Amino acid sequence: MKRREFIKNTTLTLSLCPLLSACTSKNDKFYLEDDQLPKHVRLDICTLCQLDCPQCFMRLQEEEIQKLNGFGYVSFDTFKKFVDKHPYVKEIGVSNHGEIFLNPDLDEIIKYSYEKGIKLNAYSGVNLNTISETTAEYLVKYQFGDMVVSIDGASPETYAIYRRGGDFNKVLDNIKMINKYKKLYNSDKPRLIYKFIPFGHNEHEIEKAKEVAASLDMDIMFDVNYAPGYSPLKNPEKVKEQTRISNIDNNFSNFYDAYQNGEEWFFCTDLFKNPQINFNGELQGCCMCVTEHFGVNVFEVGLEKALKSVNVQYAKKMLSDFSVVEKPEIPCTGCQIYEFLKKRNKTVF
């Protein structure tokens, strides 16, 4: 099953020569001035994970990922070079496909980012089963930003159904450890967010989860189950009322309508406003890509050249004009979101 079936809702890689050729026209140069370059990027600093969640695309596609990209983490030296080479980047989302706390260089990454005035966040989520005392303190001392903790339950028994290999009580203990340092430093950072995906097996704990989150001084967010065939909801209307999830039926049109009404975020805009970079430097573009990429390595050529590469330019053309011929080397081709837009003739740009 492909990653495209597990689209994320946020509250929100390589022969280079032909891809780095000059832009064909002035209109194709999307970033002409420094202030037009993205100030926000997502750099997946670790794709390793100790859990075995049944519908995780990193598990369902593990063999393919291992063959094409492998699993790994961004070393501190690589992270430092990226930061130093891209002074216009002011915020980095460091979570995506794995668990950031399995990166042995995380403490250095957190500290250096703070020293360089770069905000870090983990909007894409952490499982928080593993964290050292030092890292917990660094998160607070060096002002790590928002951190979404994926829990999906309010008891050890329910948590373990989906977060296989995880320990609910250990996660709560780790949250308390971070809170201890927040109190010590009199800091409200990192803001910890309790993430709960309603399933048929856990929907009875929604109200209890709200109470647990409040007791831990956490905000709570509810996310859509993008694999509705797994543990489908028993009472979707009640869940919708309890969680206020507007797209409980997994309807992409809600996202597009919000974008059309002034919301800045839509899946496809991430390629240009908040590009996703894999741990090995491959430009993946957006959250829809796991094994797919744009055939250019950001660590090797830099972000600006990567975003001006032929494949990225062509992707924007495809998203601006559906008469443009689809090409297999462009990740948008075959994408569920792209097909949704094309079917309704709703261009993004």
Would you name each region that the model predicts?
Residues 5-25:
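N-terminal export signals
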Residues 17, 43, 47-50, 262, ...:
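Processing junctions and N-termini across compartments
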Residues 26-146, 157, 161, 166-169, ...:
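Conserved alpha-helical substructure of the radical SAM core
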Residues 44, 87-95, 114, 119-123, ...:
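Conserved C-terminal portion of the radical SAM core fold
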Residues 48-50, 61-63, 99-100, 127-129, ...:
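Short, solvent-exposed loop/turn segments at secondary-structure junctions
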Residues 180-193, 219-221, 227-267, 282-283, ...:
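C-terminal accessory region of radical SAM enzymes
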Residues 269-271:
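Short, small/polar residue-rich loop motifs at catalytic or cofactor-binding pockets
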